[in-house]
From Swiss-Prot:
One of its GO terms (cellular component) is mitochondrion. Keywords: Mitochondrion. It comes from the Eukaryota. This is Uncharacterized mitochondrial protein ymf30. It is found in: Mitochondrion.
Length: 196
């Protein structure tokens, strides 16, 4: 593919093409076992997976090209169904088992590609789904955050943080201030807005 929306040739000028956004998903991080284990975990059968010993792939390419192509294409053809099935399984578990609201579940576009990241994201979504006001929970979580002291805006963020935790001691005070932020009133707390 091209990086800067242009294809460059040695003797010809560059020309622009349509821009397509591609996202690459590496399914390797979604299973501690191999590709077949991941397929089995979402009930997708890999018929040709046992037909060829992976360590003998170069030999099979030369001696049994039809089998090699069939083996390789089966893997490629199963990638998208396995990915979609895995995402649907996670979404079902998040909603039916953990109790995360439907609108807050992961999607095909934002699913982390490692099990550890997926667990972390799911825990975060569960925490945010426990309260009636997600913005209040977000405020509480930001209070627990660690500031990057090397950030060029560190002093400003620290000022916003200190202001917010000193001024809003009760949930009702915080909710009132957040309502003013949403209404774009002139009385809104600009430091709280920056903190959030």
């Amino acid at each position: 593919m091209y990086i800067n929306q242009q294809i460059e040739q040695k003797r010809n000028k560059c020309f622009n093409l349509f821009y397509y956004h591609l996202s690459r998903k590496d399914l390797r991080g979604l299973s501690t076992g191999g590709f077949k284990n991941l397929a089995d975990s979402v009930s997708i059968e890999m018929i040709n997976k046992s037909d060829l010993d992976k360590s003998k792939s170069p030999d099979a390419l030369e001696q049994l090209p039809d089998l090699y192509v069939q083996y390789s294409m089966d893997d490629a053809n199963k990638l998208i169904p396995i990915y979609i099935s895995f995402v649907n399984l996670v979404r079902r578990v998040q909603n039916e088992v953990i109790g995360i609201p439907i609108e807050d579940r992961i999607t095909e576009n934002d699913i982390p590609m490692t099990i550890g990241s997926l667990v972390t994201l799911t825990l975060g979504k569960w925490i945010y789904s426990q309260g009636s006001n997600k913005k209040v929970i977000d405020f509480a979580m930001r209070n627990l955050g660690v500031f990057d002291t090397s950030d060029k805006l560190y002093a400003f963020y620290r000022k916003c943080y200190n202001h917010s935790i000193q001024k809003y001691k009760t949930v009702s005070d915080l909710c009132s201030a957040m309502s003013e932020l949403e209404c774009n009133s002139e009385n809104k707390d600009k430091l709280l807005h920056s903190f959030l």
